[in-house]
């Protein structure tokens, strides 16, 4: 029986080719060699070869959908050998990652898949010395029929390009980003959890990997994607979480980088988050640094409050990340007749709120059971999952998982 990649780290005997038969070479061909067919028509099947556990990513007819596995062979690997009922939100090494490079003044091209593993990087790299790096996060879901859904990947591509401009970095085009995501997901298809068991978390990275000693943009950049099957982000699952309002530390400042997904934003919240978790809280809710009375966001997700069926969330003004799940929830809520306000939300409004919830790629929509502010604890509902937040959670997750019709045209299906 084939060893799980969780134990081995990654498989070194995978090959990528554009034919239906195994070849004698194990070189990973560049993406440019596969441009004669779309990445969404790739599938992994067992390759008859004297080398055990050889797989190829093979071309599928454009005129029909691709089955989850090849019907012409019985020796296939549909799912990785892990306990899908016990996965959490943690890294589980998969088979492939995707990499693409360019110079500071150049363009990204010739990306390729390679076995998942460590990367070589110069100790003088811009990302290590000056934090010149961005990341994104999105998910792939397996449908009941075996097809795979991505959720608004072009939005992540656009957000990365906006962040790259702020950080003086070149960025892949939207088309390059989306095709790279498709290619990486399909190459790791067996790691996508069964329906209802979780999702495949996709982590695109953009880093200044060229060596630079003085403070300046790096001379070379790497775009990389790796993936991991995940369960719920919070240990509580979809149960209510408990937040504490942070009054000493701040996540972002006006004119800073709080509105882009740069890596430094997340290192900066670890101290306050660690203190909060040591006290038994799930996470931290930050206030603005000027007045210390307006809600901003949680460490890694946006915040919403509900009062009398009116939904309010802090407006995007440079210090808050423009979350894609946030944007989607707002659009879903408005399509269902809810009034949604994007405005300054004061911390005092937490006292009277009927419901509070967080949104983000990792958490999707997480109900807030309580918020503690200056030693006062405010609770929301009997179980924290209010009527409005439950309705929005169900609507969004049903759409993401392919359980309801996508009238928004947000999902991208891979066969």
Curated annotation (Swiss-Prot):
Pfam families: Aminotran_4. Residues 1-65 form a transit peptide. PANTHER family: AMINO ACID AMINOTRANSFERASE, BRANCHED-CHAIN-AMINO-ACID AMINOTRANSFERASE 3, CHLOROPLASTIC-RELATED. One of its GO terms (molecular function) is L-leucine-2-oxoglutarate transaminase activity. GO terms for biological process: isoleucine biosynthetic process; L-leucine biosynthetic process; L-valine biosynthetic process. This is Branched-chain-amino-acid aminotransferase 5, chloroplastic. It is an enzyme of class 2 (transferase). PROSITE patterns: AA_TRANSFER_CLASS_4. Pathway: Amino-acid biosynthesis; L-isoleucine biosynthesis; L-isoleucine from 2-oxobutanoate: step 4/4; Amino-acid biosynthesis; L-leucine biosynthesis; L-leucine from 3-methyl-2-oxobutanoate: step 4/4; Amino-acid biosynthesis; L-valine biosynthesis; L-valine from pyruvate: step 4/4. Branched-chain amino acids are synthesized in chloroplasts, whereas the degradation takes place in mitochondria. The keyword Transit peptide applies. Its EC number is 2.6.1.42.
């Amino acid at each position: 029986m084939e060893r799980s990649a969780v134990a081995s780290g990654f498989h070194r005997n995978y090959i990528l080719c554009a034919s239906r038969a195994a070849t004698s070479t194990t070189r990973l061909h560049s993406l440019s060699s596969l441009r004669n067919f779309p990445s969404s028509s790739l599938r992994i099947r067992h390759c008859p070869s004297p080398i055990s556990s050889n797989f190829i990513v093979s071309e599928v007819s454009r005129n029909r959908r691709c089955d989850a596995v090849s019907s012409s062979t019985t020796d296939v690997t549909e799912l990785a050998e892990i306990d899908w009922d016990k996965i959490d939100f943690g890294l589980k090494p998969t088979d492939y990652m995707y990499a693409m490079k360019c110079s500071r003044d150049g363009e990204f091209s010739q990306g390729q898949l390679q076995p998942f593993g460590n990367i070589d990087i110069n100790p003088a790299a811009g990302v290590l010395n000056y934090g010149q790096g961005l990341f994104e996060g999105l998910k792939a879901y397996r449908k009941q029929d075996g097809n795979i859904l991505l959720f608004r990947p072009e939005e992540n591509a656009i957000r990365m390009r906006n962040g790259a401009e702020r950080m003086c970095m070149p960025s892949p085009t939207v088309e390059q980003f989306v095709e790279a995501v498709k290619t990486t997901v399909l190459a790791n298809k067996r790691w996508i959890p069964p329906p209802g068991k979780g999702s495949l978390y996709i982590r695109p990275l953009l880093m200044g990997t060229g060596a630079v000693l003085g403070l300046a943009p790096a001379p070379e950049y790497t775009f990389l994607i790796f993936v991991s099957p995940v369960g719920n982000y919070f240990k509580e699952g979809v149960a209510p979480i408990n937040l504490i309002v942070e009054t000493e530390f701040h996540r972002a400042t006006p004119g800073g980088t709080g509105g882009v997904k740069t890596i430094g934003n997340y290192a900066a919240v670890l101290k306050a988050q660690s203190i909060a978790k040591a006290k038994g809280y799930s996470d931290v809710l930050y206030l603005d640094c000027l007045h210390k009375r307006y809600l901003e966001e949680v460490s890694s997700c946006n915040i919403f409050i509900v009062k009398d069926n009116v939904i309010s969330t802090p407006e995007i003004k440079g210090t808050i990340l423009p979350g894609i799940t946030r944007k989607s929830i707002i659009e879903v809520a408005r399509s269902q007749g809810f009034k949604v306000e994007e405005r300054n939300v004061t911390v005092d409004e937490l006292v009277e709120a009927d419901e509070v919830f967080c949104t983000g790629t990792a958490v999707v929509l997480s109900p807030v059971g309580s918020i503690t502010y200056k030693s006062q604890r405010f609770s929301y509902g009997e179980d924290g999952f209010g009527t409005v937040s439950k309705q929005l959670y169900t609507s969004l997750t049903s759409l993401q998982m392919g359980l309801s019709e996508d009238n928004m045209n947000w999902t991208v299906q891979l066969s």
